[in-house]
Amino acid sequence: MRDRGDGELQMTNSIEDRILIQEGDLTEMDTDAIVNAANNDLILGGGVAGAIRRKGGDQIQRECTAIGSIPVGYAAITSGGQLKARFVIHAASMALGGTTTAEALRHSTGHSLRIAAERGLKSIAFPAVGTGIAGFAMKECAEIMLREAARHLRDETSLEKIYFVLFDEHARSIFEQAWKRIQAEPAGTATSA
């Protein structure tokens, strides 16, 4: 891990500098895609989804409505509306009004990465999916999402950068600590489930 001097920590290791953890506003990311912590009905209500709707405009919700419900653990892609990001990938880690499970988080993260790669995207930014309204534990979220990102980068992919954009210093610290633990594991086990 290396501090670039601009408040962003850059991870350097076997997956080089392709996973980055930072504090900030996900909706301001100038990446090919940002990920929405979505419910399976793709209703942009509160939390991250609400912020995306407010900044990205109603077009994103209209596109979600046209897609309709998707299974928990899957993801869907829409335009970025008025956001800097070209696309929003909606990771359905819970049912509307429900909670997030480890399995749903793992699958929706992996599916989001696959959708980005299928579209040939170079950069994607994730929030801490499921830790807000859905009540999933931040530490477990960090472990699952970082492992999925590392696993994805081990295969051939168009993705060059995977950002984890956390809303405060505490969340960022949890993700940084999780990443250090994962990287300290013996070779071949760092991306095991």
Where are these regions (language model features)?
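Short, intrinsically disordered low-complexity segments
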Residues: 1-3, 17, 52, 180
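Intrinsic structural disorder
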Residues: 1-2, 45-46, 168
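Short, Lys/Arg-enriched N-terminal segments with co-localized hydrophobic residues
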Residues: 2-10
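Glycine-/small-residue-enriched capping loops at alpha/beta junctions
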Residues: 11-118
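Phosphate/ribose-phosphate-bearing ligand recognition and processing surfaces
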Residues: 96-193
